[in-house]
């Protein structure tokens, strides 16, 4: 029995119609793992950074009609919330598991915080070939860094400084059938490897 990883069946929770029904499916098939990942990586981030990190599993409490198309656990050194801070995420869409670090459009002083990617631009462009950029956390669409020019990357970072809705995340994704999701051991190894890379941009 696995504790941390997700099977193709778990992703199918997003196919369930209706808000209450989908939330029930997420509670049964997805949220238990998110809570386990939350506990595991709270300790990881606290150890790695020297700050006390807190896990925030998405509640989707404001929804009254439309069922969520994704769900996640986020990590930040704030017990009350994470959206205002640069933060880490592990989450799922129907056809994608994502791991991300970056700055949401709701971020406090985001025009200053995003400069960490300017400061470490060489590290950004040196990330392995399966790392990507997300410019909107609400969409599955991500752009492989290897396929972006330096000008495009700089423009994406600058958009956070100049556009209210601008956001920037570095990301790594898996499909629901990826072999690295087959066991807790391989999945946790993949996530830790990814967060090890993301921590280069955390300060």
UniProtKB/Swiss-Prot annotation:
HAMAP family: UPF0637
SUPFAM superfamilies cross-referenced by the UniProt entry: YktB/PF0168-like (SSF142913)
Classification via InterPro entries: UPF0637 (IPR009403), UPF0637_domain_sf (IPR053707)
Naturally occurring in which organism (per UniProt): Staphylococcus epidermidis (strain ATCC 35984 / DSM 28319 / BCRC 17069 / CCUG 31568 / BM 3577 / RP62A)
Protein name as it appears in the record: UPF0637 protein SERP0693
Family, per entry: Belongs to the UPF0637 family.
